[in-house]
Amino acid sequence: MPNKTAMIKRNSDKRLTRAQVRVFQKNIYAYYDAHGRDLPWRRTRDPYRVIVSEIMLQQTQVERVIEKYTAFIKLFPDFLALSKAPLKKLLTVWQGLGYNRRALALKALAQKVIDGHGGKLPSDPAMLLALPGIGKYTAGAVAAFAFNKPVVFMDTNIRRVYIQAFFHDRADIHDDEIIPFLEQTMDVENPRKWYNALMDYGAMLKREQVNPNRRSAHYTKQSPFENSNRQVRGRILKILVKEAPLTQARIVKKTGMDPERIKKNLVQLVEEGFIKKKGRSFAL
């Protein structure tokens, strides 16, 4: 449980004293040293493995990623292997993670690293941002976890920690208000450990308290998966991985879903490069 006596009241000018920073860091590290998670991507400094884990973790629970990550790394151990991966093989190992666009983006990223960076992932967050599938958070996370750079970035767990610590009497809190606290409390000597500790502390807060993120101006609930287009697309791809080519009528029959929704999603999957249409049939 968090040490409530160590929670710091927010200064009106957003400036913290050195003592306040020390208390905050001590509280976070105390929890991490006792309860930090042993995750496979935390046992490596390989930038390739770090970026694979970060893309897998986008909008996906840690528990679901662990098994898939290990299998993925065995099949595609580096950027070169991933860049040459057949789409069918890639989507087969990706099944169960959802958001299949990430798999295509990761393959495209691997090709960019091979072609534009000599097979080595850049450490500069600005250069990382230029790669497929990489947003501001992922660029910062990769810079910190792979290269131990003291860059400022935020995810849902980190946001939760800072809202709970510094904004306990507030609602409708914007990330721009949180950033100054992130900057002041950064452990610049070991940002890798610091961010791991923040994330584990934030995950604990979600389990043991009313979620502080509900007071964030950016808080939204994830849309239900059941009967969503994500579910439709996932079923189509799962079928085509196992059996192809298939006509639209056969896909409708195998999924048992609405023909119009199948038609719409087939068109989108073709446009996005997931599948190909030849005549009346579809395949990877």
Give a label for each model feature.
Residues R233-L240:
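Hydrophobic residues on short alpha-helical segments
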Residues L266-V267:
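Short, hydrophobic-biased segments on the C-terminal half of alpha helices
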